[in-house]
């Protein structure tokens, strides 16, 4: 049987999901190389800092929306049948203020906070809240059953599933994407390289995509558990500040955030933002603390900053050739990488298969 050597560059949720789907074909021999691996916490490595949840942001009819629709069944299946993955079902209430519609956070969440969103027909238990249940200042709100992902469990779980299928993991730092072709664990040149380097695609040689930019998100993890997820379209603290609360599965703590700061590279938590995040979280869901308590009732595990790997024209999922190396790109997913992970990986795998088929056909001539 013919075998095909594939190198996936990047071990965030996009790279790991792509490697997992590739490794399900026995003929594919997959090596994952990355500067950062699950267990690392670094400003260059976005995936561990994610909330993470399923909250569709894509505009109706867009590729983004279709990717979110197509990924939901996989996340739902994991929550139902493989709780060891760190994914569990959780209700979420989403609040919308019309005055946020022209802010960075309001535009980011416009589809999510719509009173009639495209995803209402397939998420679980969707309902619009009656007006008499809306908090002061809220113009509309919805509730449905989503999933929350404990990234500290899920990313290592993806690694374990890849390894079960024969994937080999190696740490490496590349200056140029073409170098990846020489890093396959077989010692042979890779048939295809899959670029899942996220924000690093801005500076990686052979890619150098100037459409890639960071969107800074500051969060904190607390031990307090309000019992369900909550978010809101914006805040009065600034157009790039927002509030969300995500209790993670299996003792992962509750993520509270946050910020949506485009082109901000600051890796350090800002104490002023942190204070505002706490104040907003308590206003959004007072169940976080005991009655009568303020922010002093929040039991903080740690503060964090992540840089969402956004791209001006949206994710890049396409074939390329760089210095004679066949490359498939899969990067630029911004703050929605988890909720499009399976569908974008499936598209990338399809492109890899096209390249391999072409190579196979040429070899027979």
Which positions does each model-derived feature cover?
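Active-site substrate-recognition segment that forms the wall
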Residues: 7, 14-25, 32, 48, ...
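Conserved N-terminal glycine-rich FAD pyrophosphate-binding loop of Rossmann-like flavoproteins
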Residues: 2-4, 36-66
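C-terminal catalytic lobe of FAD-dependent flavoproteins
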Residues: 130-132, 157, 291-365
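Flavin (FAD/FMN) cofactor-binding and adjacent substrate-gating region
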Residues: 73-166
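Helical element adjacent to the flavin cofactor pocket in flavoenzyme catalytic cores
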Residues: 138-192, 196, 201-203, 351
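Short beta-strand to alpha-helix junction loop
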Residues: 60-74, 141-157, 268-273, 340-341
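Eukaryotic N-terminal targeting leaders
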Residues: 1-5, 23-28, 37, 355-365
């Amino acid at each position: 049987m013919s075998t095909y050597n594939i190198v996936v560059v990047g071990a965030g949720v996009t790279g790991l999901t792509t490697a997992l789907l590739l490794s399900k074909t026995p003929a594919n021999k997959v090596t994952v190389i990355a500067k950062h691996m699950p267990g690392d916490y670094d400003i260059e490595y976005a995936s561990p800092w994610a909330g993470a949840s399923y909250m569709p942001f894509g505009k109706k009819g867009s590729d983004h929306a279709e990717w979110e629709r197509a990924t939901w069944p996989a996340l739902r299946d994991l929550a139902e049948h493989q709780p060891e993955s760190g994914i569990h079902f959780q209700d979420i209430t989403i609040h919308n203020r019309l005055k946020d519609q022209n802010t960075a956070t309001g535009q980011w969440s416009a589809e999510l906070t719509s009173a009639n969103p495209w995803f209402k027909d397939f998420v679980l238990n969707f309902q619009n809240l009656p007006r008499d249940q809306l908090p002061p200042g809220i113009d509309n709100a919805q509730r449905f059953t989503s999933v929350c992902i404990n990234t500290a469990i899920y990313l290592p779980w993806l690694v374990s599933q890849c390894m079960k299928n024969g994937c080999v993991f190696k740490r490496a730092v590349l200056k140029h994407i073409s170098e990846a072709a020489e890093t396959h664990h077989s010692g042979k040149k890779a048939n295809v390289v899959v670029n899942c380097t996220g924000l690093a695609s801005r500076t990686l040689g052979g890619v150098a995509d100037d459409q890639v930019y960071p969107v800074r998100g500051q969060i904190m993890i607390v031990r307090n558990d309000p019992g369900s997820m909550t978010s809101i379209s914006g805040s009065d603290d600034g157009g790039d500040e927002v509030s969300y609360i995500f209790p993670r599965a299996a003792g992962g703590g509750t993520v509270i955030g946050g910020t949506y700061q485009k082109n901000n590279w600051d890796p350090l938590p800002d104490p002023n933002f942190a204070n505002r995040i706490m104040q907003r979280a308590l206003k959004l869901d007072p169940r976080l603390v005991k009655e009568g308590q303020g922010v002093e009732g929040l039991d903080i595990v740690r503060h964090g900053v992540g840089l969402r790997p956004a791209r001006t024209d949206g994710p890049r999922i396409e074939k390329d050739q760089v210095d004679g190396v066949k490359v498939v790109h899969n990067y630029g997913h911004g703050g929605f990488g988890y909720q499009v992970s399976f569908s974008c990986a499936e598209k990338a795998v399809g492109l890899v298969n096209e390249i391999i088929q072409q190579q196979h056909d040429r070899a027979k001539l």
